[in-house]
Amino acid sequence: MRICYFAFGASFHTKRWCEHFHSLGHEIHLITFTQVSAEEYPNIHVHVVNSGKVNVSGGNWHLVSNFWKIRKLVKQIKPDIFHALYATSYGVTGALAGHRNFVITALGSDLLVSVRNSTVYQKAVRFAFRKAKWITVMSQEMSDVAKDLGTDMSKVSIVPFGVDPQIFNATQRSLSVNEFVVTSTRNLEKIYNIPHLLKALHVVKDQIPNLKVNILGYGSLREELEALTAELELNQQVTFFGKVNQYQIAETLNRSHVFVSVSLSDGNNISLNEAMACDAFCIATNIPANRQWIEDGVNGFLVDIDDVEGLAARILQAYKSYDELQEKAGPINQAIIEERGIWSNNMKVVEQKYQEMLKN
């Protein structure tokens, strides 16, 4: 099968899709507006379309005006499947390419933030969804947004991404007896609400004398967050690691007592899935994306988005009752990941759908 992805080339998700389906023996092409090198995508046919600056935070309407370049490339490549990752910029532009087997995967903020907050985005994504032969979303909440747009729900499937169990597992788990380790693996952007976590840590730092905090991830707010860390007198506890690879994330999670995600919005919290697979005790914001994985007080804690004191109390509770809490949560989380959180299993659904589309 010849599959052409149309997506942000610097995204981990894009690399993951391209590499996975190449590993299954398919010929993979990537069309992107991002300047990426061939070394970043070995064995993938990369086609970079010069379109001016691309803002990773969104608002890339100028990309749509390049639809004729995309249409021309797609005609040259002649893919069996043309698949856009991200419903707004790439999805809308891809819809204008006119491929009969056009697929859109929504990744989260495209539906949960952009579409909800803008009538222009609503109209654009409604158009793109009409043109798509198949649409995948990562959660029931995203499916509900698609339904609200008037989408034909017979062509919408909920497909969580999940984790690679060869990387994210608890076989190498090793906790320090001298430190209580809290880890965040979310990027340093506004939507991930890292200041909220830092403020909660400030509340508990004197009650957890051996507290160590790992903040993995990169983003535009790093300097601001480092300044806040100093202001809150957390420099002794908090370390910013910047951009790290999947193996480093897994290694850190396996040395962490607690994983915290205080995101304001998520499509499917893959970072949460990774932490569950590595047996870290999970504390996350009480949003739909997290409720599909965590039942509060059963296999983790859910906290209100704006409640710093509530988050602090849950971190402190995890510190005081860690063994009891994790003994209960660990087996539940392992079973959940095994059932519906394995990347390769979930991608079998995608490959089967690709094959069905070709038959029709």
Region annotations inferred by a language model:
Residues 1-44:
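N-terminal subdomain of nucleotide-sugar transferases
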Residues 4, 174-201, 205, 214:
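Conserved donor-binding/catalytic core segment of Leloir-type glycosyltransferases
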Residues 66, 84-90:
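Short His-centered aromatic/hydrophobic patch
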Residues 141, 162:
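Carbohydrate-associated surface elements
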Residues 281-284:
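Short hydrophobic beta-strand element within catalytic cores of glycosyltransferases
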Residues 296-297, 301-308, 317-323:
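Conserved acidic donor-binding segment of nucleotide-sugar-dependent glycosyltransferases
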